[in-house]
């Protein structure tokens, strides 16, 4: 049983359209408990800066570092050509999955279609 959750948060930009709802999500998670009553640790994972593509059907791309994926011994993390934020996200996620081989991929092409690797993988239990 896992007692760690991810949640994304806009990097303290109160003017960002996602700020309010992500702050509310964080507040809700503060009181979350497991079925055994144990407190859940909430790991903050910052959102990348907004990615907008002119004349695209999505005015703002749904970019998120939480769209990572575990495959065998690998850890695939999307990047968004935001050097500082990409590095911070990699550090946070890699700490949670020690010993896995890190592989990054440019997530922009994926999120232009509405999701990234995790979204399109169709996870199936064995």
Annotate the PLM regions.
Residues 1-5:
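Short, small-residue-biased leader/transition segments that mark boundaries at the very start
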Residues 6-126:
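The feature marks the mature, well-folded catalytic cores of soluble enzymes
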